């Protein structure tokens, strides 16, 4: 170990702590919040596809300089992801990140009285936002295509991926969806 980490002495939760007797008040407060939050069902209508597999596809010797992407394509994916995150947070939009693997294993498209929704596990979404991606899994493509064909909203904020399963393909152009600028996404979600 080097640097600060080997000199880190976090406070303990034992009798030698000066605030040990008062610690119960803090933990009781958190326990009450936990109980309250556990009773509800989260409601989030926006899913942002995580482009992590595009980043993994762009890794090769020399792809990065420290923590900075040296490859402009990888840098563009990172910047697109950061911009989508910042824009949605600035618009105070509630959203979840969706992993392509979880979508492949747990995904389903459902129609109900409140319209078509994309289900991943226990959560359902009305809108899927696709940030800058280099490649997309074929399974993700099929789920988004089925979702869009049934009336679900799919928004591409930086164009369509040029690769499917890391192979050059125009299949992403078959997904019914809107190519939207981030400003349009922010406005639509407010």
List the model feature ranges, each with a label.
Residues 1-190:
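Carbohydrate-binding surfaces of carbohydrate-active enzymes
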């Amino acid at each position: 170990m080097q640097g600060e980490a080997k000199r880190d002495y976090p406070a303990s939760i034992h009798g030698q702590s000066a605030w040990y007797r008062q610690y119960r008040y803090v933990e009781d407060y958190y326990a009450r919040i936990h109980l309250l939050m556990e009773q509800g069902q989260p409601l989030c209508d926006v899913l942002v596809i995580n482009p992590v597999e595009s980043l993994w596809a762009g890794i090769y010797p020399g792809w990065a300089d420290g923590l900075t992407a040296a490859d402009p394509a990888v840098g563009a994916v990172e910047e697109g992801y950061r911009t989508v995150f910042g824009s949605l947070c600035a618009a105070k939009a509630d959203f979840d990140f969706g992993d392509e693997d979880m979508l492949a294993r747990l995904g389903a498209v459902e129609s109900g009285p409140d319209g078509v929704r994309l289900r991943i596990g226990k959560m359902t979404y009305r809108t899927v936002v696709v940030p800058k991606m280099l490649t997309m899994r074929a399974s993700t493509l099929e789920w988004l295509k089925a979702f869009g064909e049934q009336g679900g909203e799919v928004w591409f904020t930086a164009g369509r991926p040029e690769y499917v399963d890391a192979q050059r393909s125009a299949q992403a152009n078959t997904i019914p969806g809107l190519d939207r600028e981030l400003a349009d996404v922010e406005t639509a979600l407010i």
